[in-house]
Amino acid sequence: MASTACFLHHHAAISSPAAGRGSAAQRYQAVSIKPNQIVCKAQKQDDNEANVLNSGVSRRLALTVLIGAAAVGSKVSPADAAYGEAANVFGKPKKNTEFMPYNGDGFKLLVPSKWNPSKEKEFPGQVLRYEDNFDATSNLSVLVQPTDKKSITDFGSPEDFLSQVDYLLGKQAYFGKTDSEGGFDSGVVASANVLESSTPVVDGKQYYSITVLTRTADGDEGGKHQVIAATVKDGKLYICKAQAGDKRWFKGAKKFVESATSSFSVA
């Protein structure tokens, strides 16, 4: 563009000696110069606009690149949470600290983390016992006994099975005849009511699950809620029994008893 301007100015200088030929030549020169000057100015304006446009595009492009780099370089913080969700401020996966896994010889289950192991042997074939720190009535036991049955269903219905292992329901202190209060019949000092029973299948293995409420004439928190899970494998009867007193059952112990027995399975 600079060379074009020089050529036009040089052409105007050469044409100037012809000024004496008449006013028409002057008018032609004037007319011929102005359009060229206008064109030059217009070209410069276009260049300026192009520079401004390119500058704007460059800024937008640079901003886009910066935003993209920030998006790629940034990492979502584990503390970020969607609306209505609790933020994990420490950035670690949340774990269920109320239970701890226990892997025994041929079985596994979840044990309440605040329960402690106990050496008390309450049943034949008992291989594990845990109890509540504050109330030994809340406890769980695992029994492994030899059997000639091939499946838990060989014991009959869940109720039939329970009648064959009724020692799991415990004993009370008094065995004499009495007319006790609390809804017991004359001469009856204990009762057991099956509240629920089911026959779940876990990994192709049949289980029995039975929930029982036992009550005795000698009291003991108004009764005990006992949950029994059982199955048979390789000539062995596996039983998991957990319980809690009636009062604690409704104050939160139910969750620990039911979760422990429902997690019980044979390897």
Swiss-Prot record:
Keyword annotations from UniProtKB, A to Z: Chloroplast, Membrane, Photosynthesis, Photosystem II, Plastid, Thylakoid, Transit peptide
Compartments it resides in: Plastid, Chloroplast thylakoid membrane
GO function terms (MF aspect): calcium ion binding; manganese ion binding
Main subcellular location of this protein, as a coarse class: plastid
GO cellular component terms listed in the entry, alphabetical order: chloroplast thylakoid membrane; extrinsic component of membrane; photosystem II oxygen evolving complex
Gene Ontology annotations of biological process type: photosynthesis
InterPro entries: Mog1/PsbP_a/b/a-sand, PsbP_C
Transit peptide: 1-81
One Pfam entry name: PsbP
Induction profile: By light.
Entry function: May be involved in the regulation of photosystem II.
Family, as annotated: Belongs to the PsbP family.
Protein name: Oxygen-evolving enhancer protein 2, chloroplastic
Originating species: Spinacia oleracea
